[in-house]
UniProtKB/Swiss-Prot annotation:
Protein name as annotated: Formate-dependent phosphoribosylglycinamide formyltransferase
Binding site for N(1)-(5-phospho-beta-D-ribosyl)glycinamide: 22-23, 82, 286, 355, 362-363
Any one GO MF annotation of this record: phosphoribosylglycinamide formyltransferase activity
HAMAP family: PurT
Gene designation per UniProt: purT
Organism from which the protein derives: Yersinia pestis
EC numbers on record: 6.3.1.21
Role summary: Involved in the de novo purine biosynthesis. Catalyzes the transfer of formate to 5-phospho-ribosyl-glycinamide (GAR), producing 5-phospho-ribosyl-N-formylglycinamide (FGAR). Formate is provided by PurU via hydrolysis of 10-formyl-tetrahydrofolate.
GO cellular component: cytosol
């Protein structure tokens, strides 16, 4: 039976978030609801989750020694990675020393780079995926592209939010694509994956929860991407019963193989009744922010319940809902927001993340809406997001 101590007291139950962005902030809030003591960690100060944590630290999370030292200092009961750029080998070591890594250290290690999870899905589990090759030199890259054929996609094996990704349509794009991929990796230049282009009707995120009371699924989430990052997401995404069942079967296989308790964001391509595995994150997914308004329990609440070893019970979906990002372009270390009175009309909500600065384009918030149908929900969310005026000095 779970015992939760009182935060800031000797018997506190401590949760350390590795990554303190907008997703980590919502996880921190859900932890606070249960009286957990929250320690937020990121590479920069004043990150969103730090605003709602009991304590915060700024370290290079790719530095295993620094991470180990901080864990020894804080003695968390749960280590919750919220981003990929972490010294995952150290997480494996810490788990062997008795630390509880969410969902488990092996899941974070495998999913930190696209090679680990692709080989697990395609080679170990024999799941349908796009054709693929890996390369770590320009000559191997050029040969891999020739093997896959045009058009194809190149991505660093370690990157996020579309960084370093490009679509290659012909040989003239090869050199530029290689150089861009080398610039976009989280750990600097290195290995890339080359994937054959999948022709699909739509892409979904199937939020899959592995918990003490079994495997649970949220309704499928559709989304639109631009420049490798999501712009709008909606729930539920309409799809055939056969495709949904196949999506659930694939997702269940993946999360079972990864192990541990928590919420996983499984990305899948859907073409008619066929489903192809794309990627998985062993943590809440950015497209899943729509669940802040669309369900009785958000993806963040579900993640916390699961990793604490609590039952999930019933997930209720409230009908057509959508999210739209607030994505301004400016440079400022003193960001201000206006227009909330206009944005908050009807069944809408706004989340402003509280990021400390912006240089260029950056996701600073999200608008949420429910409506009678998906198309209307998307339009209402987009309009609400567009009504937020962002400025800075």
């Amino acid at each position: 039976m779970l015992t939760i101590g009182t935060a800031l007291r000797p018997g506190a139950t401590r949760v350390m978030l590795l990554g303190a962005g907008e997703l980590g902030k919502e996880v921190a809030i859900e932890c606070q609801r249960l009286g957990l003591e929250v320690i937020a960690v990121d590479r920069y100060a004043d990150a969103p989750a730090m605003h709602v944590a009991h304590r915060s630290h700024v370290i290079n999370m790719l530095d295993g020694a620094a991470l180990k030292q901080l864990v020894a200092q804080e003695k968390p009961h749960y280590i919750v990675p919220e981003i990929e750029a972490i010294a995952t080998d150290m997480l494996v070591e810490l788990e062997k020393m008795g630390q509880h890594v969410v969902p488990c250290a092996e899941a974070t290690r495998l999913t930190m780079n696209r090679e680990g999870i692709r080989r697990l899905a395609a080679e170990t589990l024999q799941l349908p995926t796009s054709s693929y090759r890996f390369a770590d030199t320009d000559s191997a890259f050029f040969q891999a592209v020739r093997d896959i054929g045009y058009p194809c996609i190149v991505k660093p094996v370690m990157s996020s939010s579309g960084k370093g990704q490009s679509l290659i349509r012909s040989e003239e794009h090869l050199q530029a694509a290689w150089e861009y991929a080398q610039q976009g990796g989280r750990a600097g230049s290195g290995r890339v994956i080359i994937e054959g282009l999948v022709h699909f009707d739509f892409e979904i995120t199937l939020l899959t929860i592995r918990a003490v009371d079994g495997i649970h699924f949220c309704a499928p989430i559709g989304h639109r991407q631009e420049d490798g990052d999501y712009r709008e997401s909606w729930q539920p995404q309409a799809m055939s019963d056969i495709a949904l069942q196949r999506a659930k079967e694939i997702s269940a296989q993946v999360v079972t193989a990864l192990g541990g308790f928590g919420l996983f964001g499984v990305e899948l391509f859907v073409c008619g009744d066929d489903v192809i595995f794309s990627e998985v994150s062993p943590r809440p997914h950015d497209t899943g922010m729509v669940t802040l308004i669309s369900q009785n329990m958000s993806e963040f609440a579900l993640h916390v319940r699961a990793f604490l070893g609590l039952p999930i019970g019933t997930i209720r979906q409230y009908g057509a809902a959508a999210s739209a990002v607030i994505l301004p372009e400016l440079t400022s270390q003193n960001i201000t927001y206006r227009g909330l009175e206009t944005a908050l009309i009807g069944d809408t909500q706004i989340r402003l993340f509280g990021k400390p600065e912006i240089a260029g384009k950056r996701r600073l918030g999200v608008a949420l809406a429910v409506a009678d149908n998906i198309e209307t929900a998307i339009e209402v969310a987009k309009k609400a997001a567009g009504n937020i005026e962002v400025s800075g000095e």
